Amino acid sequence: MNFNLTPEQEMIRDMARDFTEKNIKPVAAQYDAEKRFPYDNLKKMAELGLMGMNIPAELGGSEVGAVASSLAITEIAKGCASHAVTTSVTNMVAEVITEFCTEEVRKKHVPRICNGDYPAGSFAITEPHTGSDAANIRMTAVRRDNTYVLNGTKSLITSGEAAGVTVTWAVTDPAARKGKGISA
């Protein structure tokens, strides 16, 4: 089995490393101290293809694959954990929407994540009583006509104030065993 990186994977890692050195490390401490969201850097990262890394090109993604994506996020994390978490979650939001949503929802949101029109994507999982233990969430979603009605509370939404789109996790089948019957 060959564990060497491909030239493309090395290029993406090196690009993320270079971007982190030049754009993230110099401002990371200041952003943290000021509790400032890195809108400018996230837009630049989208322009470099770092948002939507595992998304098909027809939706605006860069299709670099899981290894290259992991390498890029690792390099970003070396400069600032906050940038890395936002990048990681935003990519995961794009992946969930691409995989599980209707074509209409995919076409509306995924290109805007990939091109940086949305500063970030967010997950709403965390609840006051259970933290981020998704198997124990209590928020419910009940289908009414052509929509869902949510009932419950989320206590932390990653990048919530800056997100252009939020994927909310809720129980849709209360009769299912623990950890099952949950939808996004």
List the predicted regions and their residue ranges.
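Internal helix-loop-helix
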Residues: 47-118, 159-165
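A structural signal for short hydrophobic beta-strand segments in well-ordered beta-sheet cores
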Residues: 139-142
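Hydrophobic, small-residue-rich alpha-helical packing segments that form membrane-like cores
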Residues: 131-133, 148
